[in-house]
């Protein structure tokens, strides 16, 4: 029974994380990045991988 609870917990965490992913492209459609939980905390966004956000 304990093993079942662990498997169910891992399954619930994975189901939650897979629903919180996405893909963003800039207006010119020449640069994009993926995020895991929220676009604002994406590493590519933080380091400016697509340049200034105004573009």
Curated annotation (Swiss-Prot):
One of its GO terms (cellular component) is membrane. It holds the Pfam family DUF4223. Keywords: Membrane, Transmembrane, Transmembrane helix. The chain crosses the membrane at residues 7-24. The keyword Transmembrane helix applies. It is found in: Membrane. It is a single-pass membrane protein. It comes from the Bacteria. This is Uncharacterized protein YhfL. It comes from Escherichia coli (strain K12).
């Amino acid at each position: 029974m304990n093993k079942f609870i662990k498997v169910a917990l891992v399954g619930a965490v994975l189901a939650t994380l897979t629903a919180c992913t996405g893909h963003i492209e800039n207006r010119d459609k020449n640069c994009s990045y993926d995020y895991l939980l929220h676009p604002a905390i994406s590493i590519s966004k933080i380091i400016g991988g697509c340049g200034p956000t105004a573009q």
